[in-house]
Amino acid sequence: MPRWSSYEIPLDSGLFTPVGLQPAAVCRLGFNAAGRWLTRHAIGHRRLVAEHHTGLVVWSAQLAFDEPAGFFDADSVEMRVTGRVRGAGTQFECEVELGGPFEPSARLRACCVPLRLDGDPALSGVPARLGPEVLAAFRPDEVELRPHRSPLPGLRTAVVSDGVTLTRGHTPFVIHRHQCEVADQWFWPEAVALAAVGREELVRAGAGHVPLLRCALRAPVRRLDLLFNRPFFLFDEGAVRSSASEWQGRLVFLHELVGPEGGQPRALVAEQFDLPEERSWD
């Protein structure tokens, strides 16, 4: 049976918005949980980098909220986490559950691509399979041959093809050091935060003539999907190209995080919100 770790953390008001847990905060907590699991059951992230010259870069992530959880619901939350190798050593996947007094709450699944590091301060590297010493730290039932496939490309195609586009927007940004990790490249939960900025700017600009957009501030996000192609680095300039659509009874925001070079987005984010059965607007 795959190994799980569980522990409790106190909750503070900075983890919440008025409508529930902050998705970017959940992603940060989830990444920390994956690091705890690796340290306890396999090889910790620091040792992977320093001793095994192996990095782990988040490539795909899915975050689902079962029920909204507010600041006044509980003093703490239980984190449950497990990890596995997938794709014959080409992926490491973690699965994180947030529970406790208000269970069920949220589930995060993140798939990382291993890198063979070059040894420079920027932690540059190329995708490579996990080495034999690293693979040996996992139990047989924690190794799966089938690779993870991101659902985001298919979701994006379906929303664009079958959804009703409500509005579009463009929000510039610059990456600063408080948004980065140790290698002076953005920490992946920043994609969630930047997408939220793009969404809120769409609401600010368009809610007057598209009242449906207000749902994205009045209700919590129910599902996020992320897909990463390349990172942003310190002081990189970029923009969030956002669109809002009504699709299959949900309000869906698609965000392309692009650099000044244009072309393929460096990251994609999809946010899904439930729509009320009765639509009455202020």
Write out the residue ranges for each language-model feature:
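Short beta-strands within extracellular/lumenal beta-sheet-rich domains
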Residues: L63, R223-L226
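HotDog/MaoC-like acyl-thioester-processing domains
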Residues: F65-S76, T82-L155, F228, F232-E237, ...
